[in-house]
Amino acid sequence: MTSLPIVPKGVKTAHDVKLCADLGFPAVYISNHGGRVVDMAPTAVEVLLDVRRLYPEVFDQIEIYADGGVRRASHIITLLALGVRAVGLGRSPMYANVYGEEGVSKLLSIIKKELTTELALIGEANSNNVRGNASFVNTRRVELEFFGAPLS
């Protein structure tokens, strides 16, 4: 056995996030694996909106990480504002890796610059002030885009 924490990855429903919290996991990793494994799997944004609506207390019980479809800093800010602790990148660094270490470094530099710009545009100095503050996300617009109607 290991003393390292075990974090379930690939969690795709609000119910499963809640279940992981109830079972005592220290964190969960919401991921639809970039939508490439299961067609029509819910995005991290969809799952987070459901968690916020159905089980808002979960954000105080465990850490939540997410990835899937993250291409720009605005995606990172959206996920942070919806309550995640960390955002993973997958496809973008893989594509950048075609150019080796220099390509990945360039990608991360671009994302860092975008993040600084996005934060300045919303009047924040760092991403810690955004985390868990859904007022930075037009959730009604996101709900309309993903679900076709407001959830509340």
Write out the residue ranges for each language-model feature.
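Alpha/beta enzyme core
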Residues: 1-66, 71-95, 142-152
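C-terminal extensions of enzymes
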Residues: 93-152
